[in-house]
């Protein structure tokens, strides 16, 4: 088939010069290009969507004097390599081999899975209309800019007489335009960004170097144009490195009622890139050619057609009536002085493979048909559609058959400027964002494969300065959900990621699971001679086992052994004793009156170098002249011989847990914790004493210095079972931003994060579904409680959660481990039974 080259299509680019976000065209017109940031609005946040549409309509209505505007959503290359290079600067030297392997695996897997990794960016193009264009500028245009680009090839083109400062009189106008568009928070682009946006249709789908492409245009405007061909109804772009194919698909019809259609968001369901180009023109409302005149003539035709349809009993009547209703609605809008626009939508999927492009086109057209959106293939119009959809090209002769008329408010029902990203821009891959409301029915891999919206995590970004759009400085994070939903998997994955960067990491493992599991994996990898970087990583972890039956551990959690601050030592000592005896009992009140001075006394002795412990205090109080005090002290001294309490009550002769290692997992054997909502038994109170000590141990760990520290505390729900526990938790949460400390609580309910007398928040929350706690979880996550949001959360499959990030964005997350060597470390249920493999 004969090719239609760009030279035969009768269209050319008219760009003359660029300055910041201003573009000079050869017909004297000047345009401003603004980058429009997107807002993260969950698909189940109806109120947030309505607000965004109102803001968007308010901004667009302010452009009526400009007569038209252009809106582009471009799929820009998401180059992850520079991001990982930035992240690698924070890798800890002792574990960097594993960190590098994980990042390389992510890059390789994404390259195999997706042709393009991209991020959608919105750009608004506005013509700057002014009556103050200088006559000198007009004259210079008339004299020398008839066709500048063709003249540039000649030597004397370099000396054409036009003002090099043409942009000066437009800068104030552009600044005023930014203020008019303040609802959209527009960004004035740099000249490099402006050139790159203008070049995008030429570069679509090609392998490029951005700086190289931009610098060519900066050197000479003649370098703006690039070779393209049109063949068999598609556009072919080429450079030295690659070839790309694209197809321009104009929208022929939208549904008659587009309320809540959210067309732009619907397009996010595709894992391949789709550029969207929109030209919008404000319609005049006066004159015979105005929209009112056209509408009146159409109404008369509808009336005659309806009469004819009635006479012939025609089935055409329904469609004619619907068209008449739309015409009447348009008249009402004009009467209400609403702004009317004609707009033209063009969708442009692209690929480096022609067969893949055709598959994508078919998939897109089938999808749009399901939503009653008709697309045109426009086989003979590809060249004109290509060139007319460049930014700043406001003549759309090739679009005449694709005109959509609506009010500005109706136009905004397409839901522009929605950001579907979650998490940080620099970090480790945590999973994929899931935009489905329905259930994946247990197939978490299908959920992962269906999304190319990557979610990254960085534990210390929240308290860093100059991070745009973040809404919290709090480093703390919570993982919540019932057993079996995936919270342990996520907790271990986050622990591994945190331990790969320059920080000190502590994991409190009350269930004593991790050491056994990690060592088992290490032995397997050693035997099979695989994943050496994982073996080295496991070797770098200091596994501490606190066994109350081992005399070497006696006093490991004694406040006098590890609480450096006198106040912390006294508070913990009182908290532990209060758990064992009733502090509200009158007799015990006498004991606490003597206990506090005794603690202070032995803290003073410790400061002088004496070896003291909790038993030293109890033994001292057995000699108290008050019989009730002595009796209680003898009781506590006797209890200290209990194997579990021996971890916290000692003579101070043994050392505390050593945390010299950068990565530590501390497990406790023999703990008997109460069930959630149940009063603790006598034996369970002893376990709680140990857990309180561990809580203060985290406080000591996090506040020791100003370097980055992270603590993971599993089974943290127990803190809420007693008043003493709640106070310990409150103290733990207060060690945060100023100390560069992050606390991660793994628990069963969002209520475990809340307290009436404590307003310390959590920067991130990962909530796995708990069927009987749907409403309270959604409320805590700041998600409106509706039937859709309930279904959205309830339908999370195993391995999915609803995540709240430091930017205040909430979305459904499919958790993903990107590296096979880590999977056995994360699995909480392992079996060698063949019949348990459901894949058979």
Annotate each predicted stretch with a short phrase.
Residues 144-155, 317, 393-412, 460-473, ...:
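Charged, glycine/proline-rich intrinsically disordered loops and linkers
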Residues 71, 187-197, 276-283, 371-385, ...:
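A generic structural motif
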Residues 39, 46-64, 76, 268, ...:
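P-loop NTPase motor domains
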Residues 111-113, 557-612, 754-840:
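P-loop NTPase motor core of the ASCE superfamily
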Residues 71-91, 103, 110, 493-595:
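Switch/coupling segment of Walker-type NTPase motor domains
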Residues 67, 120, 502-503, 541, ...:
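Short glycine-/polar-rich loops that comprise or flank the Walker A/P-loop
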Residues 1-416, 430-431:
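Extended, folded cores of ATP/NTP-driven motor/assembly subunits in large transport
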Residues 306-307, 460-485, 489-495, 506-522, ...:
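Conserved P-loop NTPase motor cores
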């Amino acid at each position: 088939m004969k090719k239609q080259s760009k030279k035969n299509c009768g269209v050319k680019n008219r760009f003359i010069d660029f300055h910041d976000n201003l573009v000079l065209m050869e017909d004297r017109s000047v345009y401003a290009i603004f980058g429009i940031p997107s807002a993260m609005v969950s698909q189940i946040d109806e109120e947030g969507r309505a607000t965004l549409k109102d803001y968007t309509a308010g901004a667009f209505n302010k452009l009526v004097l400009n007569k038209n505007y252009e809106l582009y959503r471009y799929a820009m290359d998401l180059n992850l390599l520079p991001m990982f290079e930035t992240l690698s600067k924070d890798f800890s030297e002792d574990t960097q081999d594993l960190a590098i392997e994980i990042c390389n695996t992510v890059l390789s897997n994404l390259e195999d899975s997706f042709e393009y990794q991209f991020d959608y960016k919105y750009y608004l193009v506005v013509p700057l209309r002014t009556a103050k264009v200088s006559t000198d500028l007009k004259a210079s245009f008339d004299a020398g800019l008839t066709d500048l680009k063709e003249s540039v090839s000649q030597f004397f083109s370099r000396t054409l007489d036009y003002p090099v400062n043409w942009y000066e009189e437009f800068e104030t106008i552009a600044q005023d335009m930014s203020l008019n568009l303040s609802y959209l928070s527009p960004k004035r682009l740099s000249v490099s960004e402006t050139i790159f946006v203008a070049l995008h249709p030429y570069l679509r789908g090609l392998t490029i170097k951005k700086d190289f492409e931009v610098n060519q245009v900066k050197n000479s405007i003649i370098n703006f144009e690039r070779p393209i061909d049109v063949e068999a109804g598609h556009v072919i772009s080429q450079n030295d490195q690659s070839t790309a194919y694209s197809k321009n698909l104009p929208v022929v019809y939208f549904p008659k009622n587009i309320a809540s259609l959210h067309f732009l968001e619907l397009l996010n369901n595709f894992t391949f890139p789709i550029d969207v180009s929109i030209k919008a023109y404000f319609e005049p409302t006066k004159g015979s050619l105005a929209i009112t005149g056209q509408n009146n003539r159409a109404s008369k035709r509808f009336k005659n057609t309806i009469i004819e349809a009635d006479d012939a009993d025609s089935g055409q009547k329904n469609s004619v009536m619907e068209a008449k209703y739309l015409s009447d609605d348009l008249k009402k809008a004009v009467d209400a002085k609403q702004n009317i626009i004609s707009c033209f939508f063009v969708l442009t999927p692209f690929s480096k493979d022609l067969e893949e492009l055709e598959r994508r086109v078919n998939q897109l057209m089938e999808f749009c048909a399901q939503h009653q959106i008709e697309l045109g293939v426009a086989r003979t119009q590809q060249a004109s559609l290509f060139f007319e959809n460049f930014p700043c090209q406001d003549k759309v002769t090739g679009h005449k058959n694709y005109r959509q008329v609506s009010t500005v408010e109706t136009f905004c029902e397409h839901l522009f400027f929605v950001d579907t990203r979650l998490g940080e821009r620099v970090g480790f891959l945590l999973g994929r964002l899931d935009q489905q409301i329905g259930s994946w029915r247990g197939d978490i891999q299908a959920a992962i494969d269906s999304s190319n919206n990557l979610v990254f995590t960085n534990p210390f970004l929240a308290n860093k300065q100059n991070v745009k759009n973040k809404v919290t400085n709090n480093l703390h994070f919570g993982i919540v959900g019932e057993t079996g939903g995936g919270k342990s998997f996520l907790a271990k994955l986050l622990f591994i990621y945190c331990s790969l960067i320059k920080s000190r990491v502590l994991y409190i493992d009350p269930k004593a699971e991790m050491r056994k599991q990690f060592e088992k994996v290490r032995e397997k990898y050693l035997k099979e001679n695989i994943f050496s970087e994982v073996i080295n990583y496991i070797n770098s972890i200091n596994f501490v086992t606190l066994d109350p039956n081992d005399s070497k551990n006696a006093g490991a959690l004694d406040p006098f052994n590890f609480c450096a601050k006198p106040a912390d030592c006294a508070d913990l000592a009182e908290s532990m004793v209060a758990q064992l005896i009733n502090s509200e009992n009158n007799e015990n009140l006498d004991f606490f009156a003597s206990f506090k001075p005794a603690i202070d006394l032995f803290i003073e002795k410790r400061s002088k170098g004496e070896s003291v412990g909790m038993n030293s205090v109890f033994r001292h109080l057995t000699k108290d002249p008050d019989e009730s005090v002595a009796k209680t002290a003898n009781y506590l001294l006797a209890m200290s011989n209990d194997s579990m309490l021996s971890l916290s009550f000692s003579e101070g002769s043994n050392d505390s847990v050593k945390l010299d290692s950068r990565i530590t997992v501390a497990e406790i054997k023999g703990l008997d914790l109460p069930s959630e909502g149940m009063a603790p038994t006598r034996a369970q109170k002893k376990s709680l004493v140990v857990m309180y000590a561990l809580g203060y141990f985290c406080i000591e760990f996090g506040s020791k210095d100003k370097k980055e520290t992270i603590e993971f505390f599993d089974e943290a729900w127990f803190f809420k079972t007693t008043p003493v526990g709640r106070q310990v938790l409150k103290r733990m949460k207060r060690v945060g931003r100023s100390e560069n400390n992050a606390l991660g609580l793994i628990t069963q309910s969002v209520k475990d994060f809340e307290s009436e007398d404590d307003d310390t928040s959590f920067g991130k929350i990962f909530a796995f579904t708990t069927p009987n706690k749907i409403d309270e979880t959604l409320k805590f996550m700041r998600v409106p409680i509706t039937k859709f949001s309930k279904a959205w959360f309830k339908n999370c499959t195993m391995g999915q959660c609803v995540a709240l990030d430091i930017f205040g964005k909430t979305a459904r997350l499919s958790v993903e481990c990107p590296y096979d060597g880590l999977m056995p470390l994360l699995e909480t249920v392992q079996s060698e039974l063949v019949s348990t493999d459901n894949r058979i």
